[in-house]
């Protein structure tokens, strides 16, 4: 609204002595706290002195109720409707949102899928996923990769049991101290040859993926470029959030993917667009969450074609 222009432009310029206008009196109406917005509607007048004429109380009440369960709505509302400055990132999912202990109790063999990867740099965690939709449930098959020589260091840094996850079959260790993306290719090929799961499209971020993409294309996979930007990932991330909250994503209770989802923040812009971001520590891996969001982005592009194939 106009309050943002008044607040951020003339006030800043006036304080920096860029302009000299004695007729300019910047004035910002705001709340004393965020909590009072949710506990006392009578306080809304503080940041909305024209409430009832320019802006209706019913509008604020509707958006306030929606914001309780929607991070991007909350950030946008606090900034635009109550003039409270927001940070760029916030927690994306609660544990109850992301936790789903359901297992794959139906056969996923001989299915059409959406594939996706988040390829790390040479020494970090890498993730590949297959997404299969059946009867409104999205079944996710994730698999993770890490260089063998850095595993002990990563166990100490990340404080998670990579060695146990490897023993349980959730994690493949590559020889040496660098990732071998040909093992990611091998995993996709095994799903095709052993399980009859055919990824119709495989999404990837073009950064660091040139040679791997060529290898996959030579084997007949259709590769889909998905750049990791806020406008590309916002809608699929919101859709994944809604599906997780409604328990429509069955990831076979994979502990690494669950940990990655718990580590993921939502970086938010002023328009309520979101994209995945790490929690404050650089050791909080989010690769599985990013790969799954990329899979959702590919599904959005080809939803009609995919749903026709899986009927």
Model-derived segments and their meaning:
Residues 192-200, 219-223:
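Short, surface-exposed connector motifs at secondary-structure boundaries
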Residues 13-46, 215-306:
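Metal-dependent DNA phosphodiester-chemistry modules and their immediately adjacent helices/loops
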Residues 108-133, 138:
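Gly/Thr-rich phosphate-binding beta-strand-loop-beta motif of the actin/hexokinase/Hsp70
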Residues 196-208, 212-213:
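Short glycine-rich phosphate-binding loop at a beta-alpha junction
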Residues 8, 124-129, 209-218, 235-238:
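A short acidic (Asp/Glu
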Residues 1-7:
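Short, exposed "boundary/linker" segments that immediately precede the start
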């Amino acid at each position: 609204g106009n309050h943002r222009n008044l607040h951020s432009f003339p006030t800043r310029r006036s304080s920096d002595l860029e302009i000299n206008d004695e007729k300019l009196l910047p004035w910002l109406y705001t709340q004393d706290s965020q909590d009072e917005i949710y506990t006392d509607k009578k306080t809304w007048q503080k940041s909305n002195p024209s409430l009832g004429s320019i802006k209706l109380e019913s509008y604020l009440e509707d958006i306030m109720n929606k914001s309780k369960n929607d991070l991007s709505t909350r950030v946008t509302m606090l900034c635009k409707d109550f003039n409270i400055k927001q940070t760029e990132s916030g927690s994306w999912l609660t544990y109850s949102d992301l936790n789903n202990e359901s297992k794959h109790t139906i056969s996923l063999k001989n299915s059409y899928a959406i594939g996706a990867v988040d390829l790390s740099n040479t020494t970090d965690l890498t993730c590949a996923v297959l997404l299969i939709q059946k009867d409104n449930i999205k079944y996710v098959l994730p698999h993770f990769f890490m260089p063998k020589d850095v595993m002990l260091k990563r166990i100490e840094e990340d404080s998670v049991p990579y060695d146990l996850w490897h023993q349980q079959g959730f994690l493949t260790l590559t020889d040496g101290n660098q990732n071998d993306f040909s093992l990611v290719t091998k995993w996709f090929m095994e799903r095709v040859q052993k399980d009859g799961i055919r990824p119709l499209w495989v999404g990837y971020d073009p950064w660091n993926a040139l040679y791997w993409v060529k290898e996959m294309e030579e084997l007949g996979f259709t590769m889909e470029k998905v750049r990791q930007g806020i406008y590309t990932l916002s809608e699929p991330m919101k859709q994944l959030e809604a599906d997780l909250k409604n328990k429509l994503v069955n990831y076979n209770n994979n502990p690494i993917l669950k940990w990655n989802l718990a580590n993921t923040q939502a970086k938010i812009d002023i328009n309520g667009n979101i994209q995945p971001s790490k929690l404050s520590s650089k050791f909080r891996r989010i690769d599985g969450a990013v790969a799954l969001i990329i899979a959702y982005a590919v599904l959005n592009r080809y939803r009609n074609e995919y749903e026709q194939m899986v009927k």
